[in-house]
């Protein structure tokens, strides 16, 4: 009986450990309970939450307090990996320079967050939210939720030289930045990137060689209005999130990359 009881205890303990959300930050692991119990954990109210599209209040920790010193000049990016394959490349300067203040919001298992709009899951257990995001022009794709890890990385173009714009057009150069911010979290381009939600937009054929420019613009704005399928993940980018000038720049960049 002691053996059976011991085995049952181990099984329950293992289940409890497995059920405890854990986030990796630059190779160090933090449990949700550990983060919620920190002395610097505070309540944050976000008036216009990007993911929930309404006011939300969270308990979280200032993100800067959790980050170790950067590893070198080229490690100027914070790579945020989510459990669904979304991978945001957030400029470290955006996190550290002031203005907008990033927090790591932590979902309390005893008080779970509501499900995201049109989803069955919440944004938890870990979610990067911003106080005063307008102060630093924080973009929608820089609010990664369902986080699995945060780590320092090289800037995307240094890490993947094939992302460099092929065009001398300044608009295309601006489009490169738009692509890295909005598209790279889910897509790759000629093998560059680690996002796994959508297809590679450069190979085996560049996207603008099989989709017309008007078609691409329509997909970016309202993908469900162009085509739908059961596993569709992409939602549209309205003009508030992606202004027309940024969409023009993105198209110019992808045109140059298709040559």
Segments and roles (model prediction):
Residues 154-178:
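Electrostatic cytochrome c docking/interface patches
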Residues 1-8:
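Bacterial N-terminal signal peptides that target proteins for export
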Residues 175-190, 216, 234, 250-254:
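The canonical Cys-X-X-Cys-His
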Residues 19-156, 259:
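Structured, non-membrane catalytic/scaffold regions adjacent to prosthetic-group chemistry
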Residues 11-16:
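N-terminal signal peptide c-region/cleavage motif recognized by signal peptidases
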Residues 62, 179-185, 190, 197, ...:
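Short pre-active-site segment immediately N-terminal to redox-active cysteine/selenocysteine motifs
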Residues 196-202, 222-251, 257:
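Axial heme c-ligation environment in periplasmic c-type cytochrome domains
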Residues 190-221:
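Gly/Gly-Pro-rich "capping" loops immediately C-terminal to redox-active cysteine motifs
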């Amino acid at each position: 009986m002691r053996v059976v009881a011991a085995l049952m205890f181990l099984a329950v303990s293992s289940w409890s450990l497995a059920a405890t959300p854990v986030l990796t930050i630059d190779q160090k692991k933090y449990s949700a309970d550990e983060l919620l119990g920190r002395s610097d954990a505070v309540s944050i109210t976000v008036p216009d939450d990007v993911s929930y599209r309404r006011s939300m209040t969270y308990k979280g920790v200032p993100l800067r307090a959790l980050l170790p010193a950067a590893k070198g000049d080229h490690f100027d990016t914070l790579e945020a990996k989510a459990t669904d394959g979304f991978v945001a490349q957030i400029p470290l300067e955006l996190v550290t320079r002031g203005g907008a203040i990033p927090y790591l919001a932590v979902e309390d298992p005893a008080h779970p967050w509501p499900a995201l709009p049109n989803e069955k899951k919440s944004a938890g257990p870990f979610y990067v939210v911003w106080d005063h995001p307008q102060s630093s022009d924080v973009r929608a794709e820089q609010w990664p939720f369902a986080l699995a890890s945060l780590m320092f990385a090289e800037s995307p173009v240094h890490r993947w030289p094939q992302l460099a714009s092929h065009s001398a057009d300044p608009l295309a150069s601006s489009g490169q930045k738009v692509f890295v911010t909005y598209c790279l979290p889910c897509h790759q381009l000629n093998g560059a990137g680690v996002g796994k939600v959508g297809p590679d937009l450069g190979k085996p054929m560049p996207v603008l060689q099989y989709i017309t420019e008007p078609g691409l613009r329509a997909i970016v704005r309202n993908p469900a209005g162009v085509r739908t399928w059961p596993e569709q993940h992409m939602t549209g980018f309205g003009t508030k999130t992606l202004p027309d000038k940024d969409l023009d720049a993105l198209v110019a960049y992808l045109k140059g990359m298709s040559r």
